[in-house]
A protein has these predicted regions:
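Well-ordered, non-transmembrane segments within structured domains
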Residues: 1-2, 17, 23, 154
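…primarily DNA-binding HTH/wHTH and HhH modules…
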Residues: 2, 90-153
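Short coil turns linking two alpha-helices in DNA-binding domains
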Residues: 30, 34-35, 83-84
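Terminal helix-turn-helix DNA-binding modules in bacterial transcription factors
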Residues: 8-16, 21, 25, 44-83, ...
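Short hydrophobic/aromatic patch on the recognition helix
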Residues: 38, 42, 87-88, 92
Length: 154
């Protein structure tokens, strides 16, 4: 199996299980490769670690829940695959530069949010969006190359 095919399979597994607890030991046992090898090829192919990818996907997915529901932040955290509110809030703040509650305020009409917080949100959100677009392009390119390989052997 080529490393890029393996990375696509890992991406698909992660995306399908994003709301569950995912560990490197689990990924390693599913794909029958050493976890260090899997982490290395993932980073080499995508220029992001597996755990960073998982956290950014989870946080990005939680943005819609914060924006469009009145659910408690702990409920959103648990529904996004985090085991605790503290870890979710810490990860959210690390990635976006503001807390989940500050982001929620930002999305509400007539919100009271400082210019500094607003600027932080505006500069960091495109980074996550571009990462996810880059991952989709990567997956599509691998799929296209697989189709070409198959047609060459017909």
């Amino acid at each position: 199996m080529y490393s890029n095919e393996l990375v696509v399979k890992m991406l698909n597994y992660i995306d399908d299980n994003l709301y569950k607890r995912i560990t490197m030991d689990e990924i390693s046992s599913i794909f029958y490769f050493n976890k260090d090898y899997l982490m290395r090829i993932f980073k080499k192919e995508l220029d992001i670690t597996i755990m960073d990818y998982i956290n950014k996907r989870r946080i990005f997915n939680s943005l819609e829940l914060l924006k469009n529901t009145d659910d408690l932040v702990i409920k959103i955290a648990l529904n996004s695959g985090y085991s605790s509110l503290e870890y979710y809030s810490e990860t959210f703040t690390k990635i976006l530069g503001v807390s989940p509650l500050t982001y929620r305020k930002f999305t509400k009409v007539n919100s009271q949010i400082s210019d500094k917080e607003l600027e932080i949100i505006r500069t960091r959100l495109p980074d996550i969006s571009s990462l996810l677009k880059r991952i989709d392009i990567y997956k599509n390119n691998i799929k296209r190359s697989e189709v070409k390989k198959i047609s060459l052997f017909k």
